[in-house]
Amino acid sequence: MNARASTAALSIEHVSVHFGGLVAISDMTFTVNEGELVSLIGPNGAGKTTLFKLITGAEQPDAGSIRTGDTVHLGYVDQSRDALEAGKNVWEEISGGVDVFRFGKHEVGTRAYVGAFNFRGPDQQKKVGQLSGGERNRVHLAKMLKDGGNVLLLDEPTNDLDVETLRALEDALENFAGCAVVISHDRFFLDRLATHILAFEGDSHVEWFEGNFEAYEQDKIRRLGEEATRPHRTTYRKLTR
């Protein structure tokens, strides 16, 4: 269903982003490899969505470089999930009106494919404009995966999901052949799936940590003390030239 990402799927090298005389991201460097799930954490406005825009090419850094592997196909689901046609039904939106998907040498009936995302029988005829947030999320995931994304960018993917769909999402990511970069505040999701944490800790500092969210929190307390784990306002360094 998806092409396998090359080993170095995504490389961020010495990336900096400035706005309004402030430094949003300073000299960020990390690499995402096949099989890894990297979670971006930090307060709203810290720079997580900006990083997604840099990866997709929607914005350019003020310094540094962003490279993807030769076989990488990005798949992106953003938090708004608004790029759907309200007048289409679920099957039409996902299938594009065709009866069969071809994944390499394999063929899959589109009705069966849509059903695998928990849209069965009459649910496939529901209009997109009438779907709940969780249902819209499932439609986006189905469209993204059928397009062959092997590096997934997911913005708050667990928002609005019922328990059954959340379990299905976790299982799919756990068995995913590529890699994923995920913005999430869901610590239980991150404890189960994250292999690395990229934490926007304030003062334009981003911490790269190998491990899940719980291990990162313990390391943060060791580095910065208990006070550092409490919610705080995002701060940025001033740009100096």
PLM regions and their residue ranges:
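ABC-family P-loop ATPase nucleotide-binding domain
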Residues: 1-16
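Conserved beta-strand
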Residues: 12-15, 23-33, 64
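ABC ATP-binding cassette signature C-motif
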Residues: 32, 43-241
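Short beta-strand immediately N-terminal to the Walker A/P-loop
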Residues: 38-39
